[in-house]
C-alpha cells in the first residue's frame, strides 16, 4: 500500500463511527520502490491531502526529518520538499502492517501490500 492511499482511507463505514480518520498506521514491513518524480502530479494532489495524516505517516515511516509538521505555504515553490513528499507518498510501499480505527480500535490488517478494509455484518 502506498502512503498516498493511506491518506484517503477511513473507517467511517463502521456503525457508530463519526469521522474514522486518520487511521493509526503501523508498519511491520516496507520497501522503497523508486518511481519517476512528477512535480506537477505532486502539486495537484496537495489540496486533497490531510497534512496531519501526511506527517503522521512520515513519523511511522521514520521520515520526519524530510517532512515538516506543518504544511508550508510556499510548498509548490520548494522542489526539494516536493521530491521528499513524492518519496513518502509514492515510493514507500507498506507490505505488512495494520490500520486502526481511531474511534473503535478496530484493526484492519495490511498483508502483501493490500489493506483489508472489509467489515463484518454486525459492524455496518
UniProtKB/Swiss-Prot annotation:
<comment type="subunit">
    <text>Heterodimer with Mettl5.</text>
</comment>
<dbReference type="InterPro" id="IPR039127">
    <property type="entry name" value="Trm112"/>
</dbReference>
<keyword id="KW-0963">Cytoplasm</keyword>
<comment type="function">
    <text>Acts as an activator of both RNA and protein methyltransferases. Together with methyltransferase Mettl5, specifically methylates the 6th position of adenine in 18S rRNA.</text>
</comment>
<dbReference type="GO" id="GO:0005737">
    <property type="term" value="C:cytoplasm"/>
</dbReference>
<dbReference type="GO" id="GO:0000470">
    <property type="term" value="P:maturation of LSU-rRNA"/>
</dbReference>
<dbReference type="GO" id="GO:0043528">
    <property type="term" value="C:tRNA (m2G10) methyltransferase complex"/>
</dbReference>
<feature type="domain" description="TRM112">
    <location>
        <begin position="2"/>
        <end position="120"/>
    </location>
</feature>
<dbReference type="GO" id="GO:0031167">
    <property type="term" value="P:rRNA methylation"/>
</dbReference>
<comment type="similarity">
    <text>Belongs to the TRM112 family.</text>
</comment>
<protein>
    <recommendedName>
        <fullName>Multifunctional methyltransferase subunit TRM112-like protein</fullName>
    </recommendedName>
</protein>
<dbReference type="GO" id="GO:0005634">
    <property type="term" value="C:nucleus"/>
</dbReference>
<dbReference type="GO" id="GO:0005654">
    <property type="term" value="C:nucleoplasm"/>
</dbReference>
<dbReference type="Pfam" id="PF03966">
    <property type="entry name" value="Trm112p"/>
</dbReference>
<dbReference type="InterPro" id="IPR005651">
    <property type="entry name" value="Trm112-like"/>
</dbReference>
<keyword id="KW-0539">Nucleus</keyword>
<dbReference type="GO" id="GO:2000234">
    <property type="term" value="P:positive regulation of rRNA processing"/>
</dbReference>
<dbReference type="GO" id="GO:0046982">
    <property type="term" value="F:protein heterodimerization activity"/>
</dbReference>
<dbReference type="GO" id="GO:0141106">
    <property type="term" value="F:tRNA methyltransferase activator activity"/>
</dbReference>
<dbReference type="GO" id="GO:0030490">
    <property type="term" value="P:maturation of SSU-rRNA"/>
</dbReference>
<dbReference type="GO" id="GO:0048471">
    <property type="term" value="C:perinuclear region of cytoplasm"/>
</dbReference>
